[in-house]
């Protein structure tokens, strides 16, 4: 099994990678620290899982060479599972990349990293609702202290691809909720 | 199935509407510091102060460690011990290669008194990388890692953006530039964060020519501390001058950049020390053997008279065009392997201070060291030939210009 760590620049992919593999990849507080991929391994339930730390990219339309590496990595590993790392305080634009990856049919776990910073900023995210809407596991993490990393790994094992149509349909379902006379559904 | 970007954003907006709530956000001290360091009126003086502190700590720590500690170990203990105990002794070729080539005094050759002069694989070959360069790059990487982890680099990028736009780059080019001050290899690799081929080409070429690496600066700090300011200034001016020219004549785009400035973070001691150690270990692994190899090769070339032959053959160029002694041929060969080694060699050649400045500039700009060369080849492919061409032109014009300046001043 192969896992790719993807996400915007400077959201903490390399820190998560170091946490997962015990490797020593350079991580810094500026976008573009990682410009090439690094491979590592972790062992979960007696299985060797190959993990790749991928350079940050804002979308799958590459704008520079580091982003090209990221997109190429994704294309070259069609069987990979993805951990999409998002800066929790910037949920929306992180979701853009996540949706793009989902659309291409990759199974994906969403890591809402820097969860603590978002808490400090009084940003509240309804995790359960987000999970239901997206149909994928959503895990809050604080990579530098290691919070949420083990949950991330657990959820990763059984994750399945979802259909983007399913997501937009769920949205429509939960739309019905607000209209009078709706008996309720699992959509919200 | 694929959505269009608009559809995607619509969907996200809807998702966010249902799952995301923003509470009150209070302006914190962090934000205040953030503003202070990025607004030009306060940010530029602050940046200058930071760089000044960086430089002061770098030079004083390196000097303290080298002069106060390393020199004593190497010159008072290691060198005499080897001179007494190494098989062969003066006159033996293997001894000369490994320990001490000796100093000419009239017609006699006497034992060297310092690891700077002895130029053996086990003496200078160890003393230069470990005694001089190691303390310098350790302190450099400590401070670099600090600035990186706090999150200061993107702010520096914002501040210098307007300036770098004048040469067709943008603020973010400061990242490869600063990394190159440690070692050009990661600097060249970091050019990947630039958007267009033109920008990457320019950046790589400028780095390879005008940005001396930490090891080189460390040795310069030891051998020629009094000229280092002028040399750095001349190199930085070259960086902008040739950047400006290349931007004008090269085809290609130089787009604007939208930059994410991350929040300041409290640096973690663990991450800082880990990075510092990794980078230092990289130097020990790849730098030290190369310096020792360099010393060996240079000694062998001297023994067989190859360097003397080249010096004589190239004399008109060296003396006529660049205004440096013909003996600079030796250091220039060493510079292909390690620039720090080359500077150390220059220190042993008799010349005026103006010739010394010219020679150091020449060593810096004339060709990247082998490690940088390989990385440039890997990163730019065929465009590398263009880089070499630009390099040749720059060496002859900018190196010659310095000679011209000395001539106009009447000191050459």
For the regions a language model picked out, list residue spans one by one.
Chain A
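Canonical P-loop GTPase G-domain recognition
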Residues: 116-167
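Helical mechanochemical/support elements of P-loop NTPase systems and associated helical scaffolds
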Residues: 31, 35, 50, 62, ...
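Conserved G1/Walker A P-loop phosphate-binding module
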Residues: 1-60, 77
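Conserved C-terminal guanine-recognition region of P-loop GTPase G domains, centered on the G4
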Residues: 42-46, 69-138
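Conserved nucleotide-binding/hydrolysis micro-motifs of P-loop NTPases
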Residues: 32, 56-57, 88-91, 114-118, ...
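Cysteine-cluster motifs in flexible loop/terminal segments that predominantly coordinate metals
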Residues: 171-188
């Amino acid at each position: 099994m192969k896992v790719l760590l993807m996400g915007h620049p400077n959201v903490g992919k390399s820190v998560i990678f170091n946490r997962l593999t015990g490797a020593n990849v350079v991580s810094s507080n500026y976008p573009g620290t990682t410009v090439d991929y690094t491979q590592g391994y972790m062992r979960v339930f007696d299985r060797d899982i190959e993990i790749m730390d991928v350079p940050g990219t804002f979308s799958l339309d590459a704008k520079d060479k580091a982003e090209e590496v990221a997109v190429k990595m994704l294309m070259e590993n069609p069987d990979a599972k993805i951990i999409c790392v998002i800066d929790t305080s910037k949920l929306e634009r992180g979701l853009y990349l996540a949706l793009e990856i989902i659309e291409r049919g990759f199974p994906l776990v969403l890591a809402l990293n820097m969860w603590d910073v978002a808490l400090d900023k009084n940003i509240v995210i309804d995790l359960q609702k987000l999970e239901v809407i997206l149909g994928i596991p959503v895990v809050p993490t604080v990579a530098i202290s290691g919070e949420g990393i083990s949950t991330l790994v657990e959820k990763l094992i059984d994750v399945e691809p979802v259909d983007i149509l399913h997501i937009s349909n769920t949205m429509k379902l939960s739309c019905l909720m607000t209209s009078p006379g709706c008996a309720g559904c699992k959509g919200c | 199935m694929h959505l269009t970007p608009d559809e995607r954003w619509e969907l996200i907006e809807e998702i966010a509407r249902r799952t995301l709530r923003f509470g009150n956000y209070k302006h914190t001290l962090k934000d205040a510091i953030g503003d202070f360091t990025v607004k030009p009126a306060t940010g530029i003086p602050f940046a200058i102060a930071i760089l000044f502190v960086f430089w002061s700590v770098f030079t004083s720590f390196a000097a303290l460690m080298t002069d106060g500690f390393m020199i004593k170990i190497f010159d008072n203990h290691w060198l005499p011990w080897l001179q007494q105990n190494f098989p062969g002794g003066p006159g033996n070729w293997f001894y000369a290669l490994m320990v001490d080539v000796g100093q000419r005094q009239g017609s006699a050759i006497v034992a060297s008194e310092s690891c700077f002069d002895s130029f053996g694989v086990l003496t200078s070959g160890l003393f230069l990388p470990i005694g001089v360069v190691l303390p310098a790059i350790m302190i450099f990487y400590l401070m670099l890692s600090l600035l990186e982890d706090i999150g200061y680099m993107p702010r520096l990028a914002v501040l210098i953006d307007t300036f770098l736009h004048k040469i067709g780059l943008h603020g973010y080019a400061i990242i490869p530039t600063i990394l190159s001050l440690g070692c050009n290899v990661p600097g060249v690799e970091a050019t990947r964060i630039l958007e267009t081929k033109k920008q990457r080409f320019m950046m790589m070429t400028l780095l390879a020519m005008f940005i001396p690496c930490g090891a080189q600066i460390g040795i310069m700090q030891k051998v020629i501390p009094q000229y280092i300011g002028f040399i750095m200034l001349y190199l930085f001016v070259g960086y902008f001058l040739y950047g400006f020219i290349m931007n004008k004549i090269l085809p290609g785009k130089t787009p604007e950049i939208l930059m994410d400035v991350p929040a300041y973070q409290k640096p973690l001691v663990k991450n800082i020390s880990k990075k510092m150690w990794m980078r230092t270990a990289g130097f020990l692994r790849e730098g030290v053997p190369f310096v020792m190899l360099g010393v060996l090769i240079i000694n062998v070339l001297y023994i067989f008279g190859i360097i003397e032959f080249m010096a004589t053959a190239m004399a008109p160029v060296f003396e006529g065009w660049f205004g440096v002694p013909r003996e600079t041929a030796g250091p220039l060969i060493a510079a292909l392997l390690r620039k720090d080694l080359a500077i150390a060699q220059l220190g042993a050649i008799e010349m005026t201070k103006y010739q010394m400045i010219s020679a150091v500039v020449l060593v810096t700009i004339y060709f990247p060291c082998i490690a940088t060369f390989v990385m440039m080849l890997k990163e730019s492919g065929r465009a590398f030939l263009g880089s070499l061409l630009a390099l040749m032109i720059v060496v002859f014009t900018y190196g010659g210009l310095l000679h011209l300046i000395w001539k106009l001043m009447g000191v050459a």
